[in-house]
A protein has these predicted regions:
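Short, low-complexity disordered leader/linker segments with a strong preference
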Residues: 1-39, 354-356
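Early extracytoplasmic/lumenal segment of secretory-pathway proteins
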Residues: 25-27, 33-100
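Extracytoplasmic ligand-binding site segments that recognize negatively charged/polar headgroups
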Residues: 44-51, 88-230
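Short, hydrophobic alpha-helical packing/hinge segments within bilobed ligand-binding/sensory domains
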Residues: 76-80, 99, 161, 222-225, ...
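A ligand-binding cleft/hinge motif common to bilobed small-molecule-binding domains
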Residues: 97-101, 227, 232-250
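Periplasmic-binding protein-like
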Residues: 139, 203-208, 247-271
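Mature extracytoplasmic/periplasmic domains
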Residues: 270-329
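Conserved C-terminal helix/tail region of periplasmic/extracytoplasmic solute-binding proteins
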Residues: 327-356
Length: 356
């Protein structure tokens, strides 16, 4: 089934969000909620790929049409807060930190396991009790590097960022982005007493800072630095390397020797959602082998369902880690440790690291 795509602008509390209708026909403009329509809120990138991989097949399978709202994590969470328990969203796909932040304000409800049988199929880390909704994909932190300049073993060591000969030739993520928190926790685990030892992490990062060419805040920044030869290595998410490796660039990605952490993207159902039944059906399909395989192939998402097929493009970057990241030494971070400290850590990172 070919879905139509149209864009409307929704402004909530001064925040503009793009809305796309990805369905055979649009939902009614008012009146009672439509049991055959759900609204899914997701990230503002890769929407057409997500439509092809998940939305269209879901609509064909269930007859449920899907309206897709897009926006940043923070903007979409703000919209839920403004909605006051009467959201116009049935499913929100959001990063784990923001999912936890929303739970603090009771913005999400528990996903009913009895209504989502695919939960039985996914990896244990994807259904942690800490979250009210399951993970549907995840992101691995590691080092992206020039294969002309470094070996995988060299790139895997955190001490890489302290080497005099590489001063000015490396980059690190800002703590405000996903890779940044994973990096901070990796450094804390290597040089301190665990992933939340912020004092040890900031001390070490502060020592490295003068030799760091840039603390980046987007994938475009770091990939450009690497492909243009301005740096030889950078801490990054594995997904940043996929297109570069596929295109034949002399670039690879490797997991760190120690301090391996991953972030997850969660499927959350907002408190007060109008079509919970439709939301459950969507989450169930999203976690299925069919959708997970398609999403890995088309979107590039790492699947949480072990039965899904991992495409060659992903395996070329992460190898067999994708089949079982926990067995490969990766773990998730505890949001109860991160949510209360987030503002303080971001402020300290700016003072003690990036300003040096």
């Amino acid at each position: 089934m070919t879905s139509t795509l149209r864009t409307r602008l929704a402004i909530v509390a001064g925040v503009a969000a793009t809305t796309l209708v990805l369905a055979g026909c649009s939902a009614d403009g008012g009146g009672e909620p439509d049991a055959d329509t759900i609204t899914v809120s997701t990230f503002p990138f890769g929407v057409e790929e997500f439509q092809e991989a998940v939305i269209d097949p879901f609509t064909e399978k269930t007859g449920i049409e899907v309206v897709v709202d897009t926006g940043s994590n923070s903007d979409r969470l703000s919209q839920l807060q403004v909605a006051g328990g009467q959201p116009d969203v049935d499913v929100m796909l959001i990063s784990d930190y923001y999912a936890a932040l929303g739970q603090e304000d009771d913005l999400f409800q528990q996903v009913d396991a009895s209504a989502v049988p695919s939960l039985d199929e996914i990896a244990d880390f994807a259904k942690e009790d800490t979250y009210l909704g399951p993970a549907y994909s995840y992101q691995l932190n590691g080092t992206m590097y020039s294969t002309d300049e470094l070996t995988a073993d060299e790139a895997a060591e955190w001490s890489l960022y302290s080497e005099d000969e590489l001063s000015g030739k490396v980059a690190l993520p800002d703590i405000s982005v996903t890779a940044g928190q994973l990096m901070v926790s990796g450094v804390a685990a290597e040089y301190g007493d665990g992933p939340y030892d912020i004092d040890a992490a900031l001390d070490q990062l502060g020592e490295w800072a003068p030799g760091v060419l840039q603390f980046y805040s987007s994938s475009t920044e770091v990939t450009n630095l690497l492909t243009q030869g301005e740096i030889v290595a950078a801490d990054s998410l594995s997904g940043f390397a996929t297109d570069l490796v596929e295109s034949g660039e002399p670039i690879a990605w490797t997991a760190p020797a120690t301090g391996r952490y991953m972030a997850t993207n969660r499927a959350m159902i907002p408190t007060g959602a109008e079509n919970v039944d439709g939301a459950n059906q969507f989450v169930d399909y999203l976690l299925s082998v069919e959708a997970q395989t398609s999403s890995a192939e088309i979107v590039g998402d790492l699947p949480v369902n072990p039965g899904a097929t991992v495409p060659d493009t992903i395996e070329a970057v992460v190898g067999d880690i994708a089949s079982d990241p926990v067995a490969a030494g990766y773990s998730t971070l505890d949001p109860t440790e991160l949510v209360p400290t987030r503002s303080e850590w971001v402020d300290r990172f700016a003072r003690e690291v990036t300003s040096r």
